[in-house]
Design a protein with these regions (language model features):
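Nucleic-acid enzyme cleavage-core boundary/entry regions
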Residues: 1-145, 154-243
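G-domain G4 guanine-recognition motif of GTPases
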Residues: 151
Length: 243
């Protein structure tokens, strides 16, 4: 087996650091807290090394609690639907002028963490005006209507696909994606090379009909993409005047 290499540490120092892990295994510390204590303050030294810890310490390594997933939410009293938003600026704009009946959740592009959504270790930070108890009761309800809105690119579609593992009813939010699609179809998008998106991979199918039949074909045909900050969602009653 290939020996672990950590820049700045000699092989002997690496062995010593791993040997120092054991006393911390039953102290309810996260992997990054343990790493910072054993590897000269480097909290990421043990990232992606859980299998090695299992070989060294067996089931003791399984006592390390998962790192909590911290999410920001705005959940007005009486909401009935959930909208997950990929990017911070767009999330905060929607909080200022929220779509009717929706709670909003800022995902922060957590593609790699999507499978942890339903974990007991997930934590929420609620913006003022929220009803935290109602949100916690309803947000993973498989009967509740839920949507995702993010960048119109393969990575964004991949996030939607991953989120559907925890939220099977999740659909792309058409009020957000439709105006983006119109821009994309009129050559208003950017090339993947412009924003270093060439490494993004096509997710294939997501299980969301609108995504699979409309959004993904447009991305493939135009070979361009559009970040969600490019558009502004008008307030629910914009343009409506009282008689």
């Amino acid at each position: 087996n290939q020996k672990p290499q950590i820049p700045g540490l000699t092989p002997a120092e690496i062995v010593n650091a791993f040997a120092n892990v054991e006393p911390y295994l039953n102290q309810n510390l996260t992997l990054r807290e343990i790493a910072a204590r054993c590897f000269n303050g480097d909290s990421k030294a043990l990232d992606n090394r859980h299998e090695l810890l299992l070989k060294l310490y067996g089931d003791k390594a399984n006592t390390i609690p998962p790192r909590p997933l911290l999410l920001t939410a705005w959940a007005p009293p009486g909401f009935t639907k959930l909208l997950i938003v990929e990017n911070q600026d767009s999330f905060l704009r929607l909080v200022e002028a929220p779509p009717e009946d929706y709670a909003l959740l800022y995902s922060g592009g957590f593609r790699a963490s999507a499978t942890r959504l339903s974990s007991e270790h997930t934590r929420f930070a609620f913006l003022p005006g929220s009803d935290p108890e109602r949100f916690k009761q309803r947000w993973l309800d498989e009967q509740a209507e839920c949507h995702f809105w993010g960048d119109l690119d393969f990575a964004g579609m991949g996030i939607l696909k991953a989120l559907r593992n925890s939220l099977p009813n999740l659909q792309a939010w058409q009020p957000g994606y439709q105006p983006m699609l119109e821009i994309l179809n009129t050559r208003g998008g950017h090339a993947p090379q412009q924003t270093r998106k060439t490494a993004q991979t096509d997710p294939g199918t997501t299980g969301c009909p609108y995504t699979d039949t409309t959004l993904l074909p447009a991305l493939r045909q135009t070979n361009t993409a559009l970040d969600q900050e490019a558009i502004h969602i008008p307030p629910p009653n914009a343009g409506i005047t009282n008689p």
